[in-house]
UniProtKB/Swiss-Prot annotation:
Name this polypeptide is given: Undecaprenyl-diphosphatase
EC numbers, comma separated: 3.6.1.27
Protein task: Catalyzes the dephosphorylation of undecaprenyl diphosphate (UPP). Confers resistance to bacitracin.
Family membership noted in the UniProt record: Belongs to the UppP family.
Any one Gene Ontology molecular-function term assigned to this protein's record: undecaprenyl-diphosphatase activity
Recorded name of the encoding gene: uppP
Native species: Nocardioides sp. (strain ATCC BAA-499 / JS614)
GO CC terms of this entry: plasma membrane
Subcellular localization, as worded in the UniProt entry: Cell membrane
GO BP, sorted A to Z: cell wall organization; peptidoglycan biosynthetic process; regulation of cell shape; response to antibiotic
Keywords: Antibiotic resistance, Cell membrane, Cell shape, Cell wall biogenesis/degradation, Hydrolase, Membrane, Peptidoglycan synthesis, Transmembrane, Transmembrane helix
Additional remark text: Bacitracin is thought to be involved in the inhibition of peptidoglycan synthesis by sequestering undecaprenyl diphosphate, thereby reducing the pool of lipid carrier available.
InterPro entries, alphabetized: UppP
């Protein structure tokens, strides 16, 4: 029963933090340590992220259907190849390549060295400041309809940084999008779509490690956490898309810096283990 209660809390944390630029993987590493539960493991973290990505699939189902259909048609009908949705399909595929290749190449490092709270606290602060600068200096004249192959590659490279817990997949992509001149809504929407292949792929790949490996929980608690993350994540998407139409990322920047600094202090004083 304790495992299920812990999984429920972790699913709630995942759902609340996955789409905000504050790093869900960092929260799933930091808060279990604060609660005395220990590290839930990279496999658990990757698998419950499937729940939030299913929320993306549901929320953007019309966009995804339109993009997928146009992309498939473009493979056989030349007249579709210049269509925005067909190009968007290619941009998402190309933008996913960096994180897939690096994720496979650095798997052992990601599951061990990258989970150090020293590193996570530092990346929360540094990438939080980067997000703040990007949001402050970035233009607001480009919409998602103006995305180019170059921009898709650059945002894909930025997303790959999120293999380090504390960076934040959405935070890295949003930062690059804002620096490239996209408005907040466009950068946010594209960040959600770009994450789908990588996150679902990583979650499926890690399914084999749920009953063993470094995972603290079995199938039951993991399924509970995944369902909770889906429900909460769906609500978080709707809220964030409304929020970014009128407000800046400043509150997220302040929160990241505060959490990162607190994490480093707690580790340095021995309150929690690195």
């Amino acid at each position: 029963m304790v495992d299920f209660l812990q999984a429920l809390v972790l699913g709630l944390i995942q759902g609340l933090t996955e789409f905000l630029p504050i790093s869900s993987s960092a929260h799933l590493r930091i808060y279990p340590e604060l609660f005395g539960w220990g590290d839930p493991g990279a496999a658990f973290t990757a698998v419950i992220q499937i729940g939030t990505e299913v929320a993306v699939l549901m929320f953007f189902r019309k966009d995804i259907w339109r993009i997928g259909r146009a992309w498939l048609l473009s493979l056989f009908k030349p007249e579709y190849r210049g269509h925005l949705d067909a190009r968007m399909g290619w941009f998402i595929i190309v933008g996913s390549v960096p994180i897939v290749l690096l994720g496979i190449a650095l798997k052992d490092v990601i599951e061990e060295d990258f989970r150090s709270l020293w590193l996570i606290g530092t990346t929360l602060i540094v990438l939080g400041l980067v997000l703040g600068v990007a949001d402050r200096l970035g233009g607001t004249d480009k919409t998602i309809k103006q995305i180019s192959l170059r921009d898709a590659i650059l945002m894909g490279l930025a997303q790959a940084l999120a293999l380090i817990p504390g960076v934040s997949r959405s935070g890295a992509t949003l930062s690059m999008g804002r620096l490239l001149g996209y408005d907040r809504e466009a950068a946010t929407r594209y960040a959600f779509l770009l994450a789908i292949p990588a996150v679902i792929g990583a979650g499926v790949f890690e399914l084999k490690d749920i009953p063993n490996g470094d995972n603290l929980y079995g199938w039951g608690p993991t399924i509970v956490a995944t369902i909770v993350s889906f429900v909460v994540g769906y609500a978080a998407i709707a809220w964030l898309l409304r929020y970014v139409t009128t407000r800046s990322y400043a509150p997220f920047v302040l929160y990241r810096v505060a959490l990162g600094a607190a994490t480093l202090v707690l580790v340095a004083t021995g309150v929690i283990a690195a």
